[in-house]
């Protein structure tokens, strides 16, 4: 009887009914090494990742589409007519509206006076609808506003590898950017 009691006690004591939920795991995407070619559009040119497609929206507005990432970079060309400050304020307003969903905003500037290329890039950390926005200007007559969108629900942790990939492409676009004389 004593042995039966001890065996019963050990049987019930060793049963642990608490279970942990199955962790969701995501595979890290593997990207091929990007290859670039020079792309001329409207009155500007830059190095474009060959894994992306350029889609013309209208006259001088384009979309760089990454089919494998289901992501888009919009390039909106605006002609400057002494309204650089006004455009900068509108762009800042757009950044402010987008920042509502961001935990942090990181900025970076780029300038190449020899090519008359000036840029400011905004990186949004968090579940923001657009994780990267930037503009390019010659500060005289040309201004390009740009934003990046993924065709998915904003989930920063899941999108982070894709954001890093596109961020390096955007840096390549900006560093290789050049205005074509009109």
Task: Name each model feature, range by range.
Residues 1-6:
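Sec-dependent signal peptide recognition
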Residues 12-14:
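C-terminal motif of bacterial Sec signal peptides marking the signal peptidase cleavage site
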Residues 16-18:
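Bacterial signal peptide processing site
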Residues 23-43:
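Post-signal peptide N-terminal segment of mature Sec-exported envelope proteins
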Residues 40-95:
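Secretory pathway targeting signatures of secreted, lumenal, and periplasmic proteins
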Residues 52, 147-182:
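Surface-exposed amphipathic alpha-helical segments
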Residues 53, 89-147:
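Signature of long, low-cysteine stretches enriched in small and polar/charged residues
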Residues 73-81, 133, 156-164:
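Second-shell loop/turn segments in exported
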């Amino acid at each position: 009887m004593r042995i039966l009691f001890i065996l019963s006690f050990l049987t019930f004591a060793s049963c642990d009914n608490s279970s942990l939920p199955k962790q969701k795991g995501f595979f890290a995407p593997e990207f091929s090494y990007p290859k670039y070619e020079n792309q001329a559009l409207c009155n500007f040119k830059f190095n474009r990742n060959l894994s992306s497609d350029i889609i013309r929206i209208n006259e001088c507005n384009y979309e760089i589409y990454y089919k494998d990432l289901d992501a888009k970079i919009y390039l909106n060309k605006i002609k400057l007519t002494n309204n650089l400050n006004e455009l900068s304020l509108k762009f800042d307003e757009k950044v402010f509206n987008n920042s509502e969903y961001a935990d942090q905003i990181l900025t970076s500037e780029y300038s190449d006076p020899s090519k008359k290329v000036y840029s400011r890039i905004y990186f949004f950390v968090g579940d923001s609808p657009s994780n990267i926005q930037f503009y390019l200007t010659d500060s005289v007559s040309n201004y390009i506003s740009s934003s990046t969108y993924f065709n998915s629900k904003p989930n920063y942790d899941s999108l982070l590898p894709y954001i890093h990939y596109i961020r390096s492409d955007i840096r390549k676009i900006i560093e290789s950017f050049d205005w074509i004389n009109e």
